């Protein structure tokens, strides 16, 4: 998002305060006023919910795992991992997509049939907060890559370099969501928490949410003739032999 589309936590708190009839203050994040104390908590809740509401381009990150034959096949996820972007998992050394994420039942089937010595292409699942692959131990030198949504929706005030976290603890920190989006969502949260009607505020939020989720990334030209889309995982991008179960 552009630099002009974001603002500090203090500015967002004052912006929403004015909209709901509260006088702005110099440093709302340090204020002990009960209204601002409540708004600080709700601002963090709003940001956490927005992370999971849409695969925002600004939160996308790439993760890479290079395997060794000494690995267990269980890998720690990044500290800021929220969730994987579906169909972005690839094993790049052999240029094939990862199979998964597998359910518990499918995982039990793989292990029960013992395909470890067969030419099975890499399967994965998430369990116990870890990224697991099969077969395990894996072959040496696999290059496993996938995209994920980061929980780091809060940026530091200074760029030396910027750091990102999942919680606002100071008023000069900057939520990287569009300022109108997060302001309108905080307003909904605040009105709801204080028992006021949220109909208009919710409609305003829904409008900006729909606009931003529809325009933050490019889109293909629609073909009314039913043209073929690119099959990310299919016969055109996996080998003819040496894969599968």
Kindly give the residue locations of the regions a language model identified:
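Glycine-enriched, solvent-exposed interface loops adjoining structured elements
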Residues: 1-245
């Amino acid at each position: 998002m552009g630099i002009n589309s974001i603002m500090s936590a203090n500015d967002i708190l004052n912006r929403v305060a004015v909209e709901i009839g509260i006088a702005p203050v110099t440093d709302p994040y340090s204020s002990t006023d009960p209204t601002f104390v409540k708004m600080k908590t709700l601002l963090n809740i709003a940001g956490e919910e927005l992370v999971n509401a849409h695969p925002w381009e600004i939160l996308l990150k790439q993760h890479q795992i290079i395997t060794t034959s000494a690995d267990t096949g269980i890998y720690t996820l990044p500290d800021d991992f929220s969730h994987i972007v579906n169909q972005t998992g690839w094993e790049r050394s052999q240029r094939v997509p990862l199979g998964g994420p597998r359910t518990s039942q499918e995982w039990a089937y793989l292990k029960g049939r013992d395909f470890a010595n067969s030419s099975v292409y890499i399967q994965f699942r998430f369990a116990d907060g870890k990224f697991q692959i099969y077969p395990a131990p894996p072959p040496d030198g696999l290059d496993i890559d996938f995209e994920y949504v980061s929980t780091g929706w809060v940026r530091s005030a200074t760029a030396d370099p910027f750091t990102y976290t999942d919680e606002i603890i100071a008023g000069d920190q900057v939520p990287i969501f569009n300022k109108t989006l997060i302001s309108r969502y905080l307003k909904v949260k605040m009105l709801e928490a204080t028992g006021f009607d949220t109909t208009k505020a919710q409609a305003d939020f829904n409008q900006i949410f729909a606009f931003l989720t529809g325009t933050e990334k490019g889109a293909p030209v629609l073909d009314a003739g039913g043209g073929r889309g690119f099959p990310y995982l299919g016969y055109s991008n996996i080998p003819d032999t040496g894969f599968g179960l």
